[in-house]
């Protein structure tokens, strides 16, 4: 549930990266270009050997926090370690090969203020193939409601959750 006194809650965005340079610039740009601006990026460099760090450093934004691990850790463990570094009221995950629509955070935060009983909100998502072809994964016809947290986690839809 959203804190009723917080008009502009901080959203902690976790990005776990292991050699994710290929689409990293587009992914981070989609976060920087959000209409909702009160976010922090916890960039968890999971022992990358490519130019991921150099791509990240092209963005000089005080909201970006860089952490490097000296040993590779499984994704679930890396995410849990990154969660410990967050300071936001909300947590979301953005993978290095994902892009967010510009109003994603704004619309999700608005939903929390409209319904004080919400614990989680999520979005539809698309797969992009070679940046041109798209395939919609979830349609409005079968979006679950009610007690949905476990359903979302069971179907690996963590990228759309806030």
Residues covered by each model-derived region:
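N-proximal low-complexity "stem/linker" segments adjacent to membrane-targeting elements
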Residues: 1-32
